[in-house]
């Protein structure tokens, strides 16, 4: 399945919640009609079965992190192999992706922009260039914007936008040097309350 290249607002409207796919320059309700689904009959949302709710939750999280189904399923398999709560581990794996960490540190306005920055070799991990968006960042790793990329206007704008976001306890960022350290594993309590990971686990465990 190809990656979706259409309007970002349409995806958020489909899920009925902000997926943080846009920069946040304007309030989301100014850009998207969040109270209605896309399409001619969007004003009337269909009542979903339990299975339908599970599918929607999977789609929502996949779209939020910009991941295709095959790769998303691999994250579930890996999470189920590890000790502890499978749902929390799944979110930890998603949050530990390099493109997401770059976004969380405020070096990009969206996860899609962060992915592009990584692919174009604008990011270093522990002093070495890494162009793999799905690379797992571990506690103690230092993520930095490469010198040649620091003057990009989009990065400077992203840093300004990030000042209005809630600070996360598991990362430490120096906005002057444009580098940050992942201090610990992502904390589930600081992630979106709109995510119900248990529905995803129920879907895949059938």
Curated annotation (Swiss-Prot):
Q: Name one GO biological process term.
A: translation
- One GO cellular component from the entry? small ribosomal subunit
Which SMART domains would you find in this protein's record? Ribosomal_S4, S4
Subunit details for this protein?
A: Part of the 30S ribosomal subunit. Contacts protein S5. The interaction surface between S4 and S5 is involved in control of translational fidelity.
Protein function:
One of the primary rRNA binding proteins, it binds directly to 16S rRNA where it nucleates assembly of the body of the 30S subunit.
Q: According to its UniProt record, which protein family does this protein belong to? A: Belongs to the universal ribosomal protein uS4 family.
This chain's source organism reads Francisella tularensis subsp. mediasiatica (strain FSC147)
InterPro entries for this protein: Ribosomal_uS4 (IPR022801), Ribosomal_uS4_bac-type (IPR005709), Ribosomal_uS4_CS (IPR018079), Ribosomal_uS4_N (IPR001912), S4_RNA-bd (IPR002942), S4_RNA-bd_sf (IPR036986)
Q: Where is the S4 RNA-binding domain?
A: 96-158
Q: Name one Pfam family in it.
A: Ribosomal_S4
Q: Name one GO molecular function term.
A: structural constituent of ribosome
Return the protein name.
Answer: Small ribosomal subunit protein uS4
Provide this UniProt record's keywords sorted from A to Z: Ribonucleoprotein, Ribosomal protein, RNA-binding, rRNA-binding
* Annotated CDD domains: S4 (cd00165)
Specify the superkingdom: Bacteria
């Amino acid at each position: 399945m190809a990656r979706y290249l259409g309007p970002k607002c349409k995806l958020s409207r489909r899920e009925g919640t902000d997926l943080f796919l846009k920069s946040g320059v304007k309030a989301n309700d100014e850009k998207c009609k969040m109270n209605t689904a896309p399409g001619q009959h969007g004003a009337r949302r269909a009542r979903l079965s339990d299975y339908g709710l599970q599918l929607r939750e999977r789609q929502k999280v996949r779209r939020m992190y910009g991941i295709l189904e095959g790769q998303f399923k691999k994250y579930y398999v890996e999470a189920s192999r590890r000790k502890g709560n499978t749902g929390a581990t799944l979110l930890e794996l998603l949050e530990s992706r390099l493109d997401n960490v770059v976004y969380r540190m405020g070096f990009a306005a969206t996860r899609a922009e962060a992915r592009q920055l990584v692919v174009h070799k604008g990011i270093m991990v522990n002093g070495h260039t890494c162009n793999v968006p799905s690379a797992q960042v571990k506690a103690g790793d230092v993520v930095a914007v490469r010198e040649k990329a620091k003057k990009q206007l989009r990065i400077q704008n992203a840093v300004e936008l990030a000042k209005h976001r809630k600070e996360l306890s598991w990362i430490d960022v120096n906005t002057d040097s444009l580098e940050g350290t992942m201090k610990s594993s992502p904390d589930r309590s600081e992630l979106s309350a709109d995510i119900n990971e248990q529905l995803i686990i129920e879907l895949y465990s059938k």
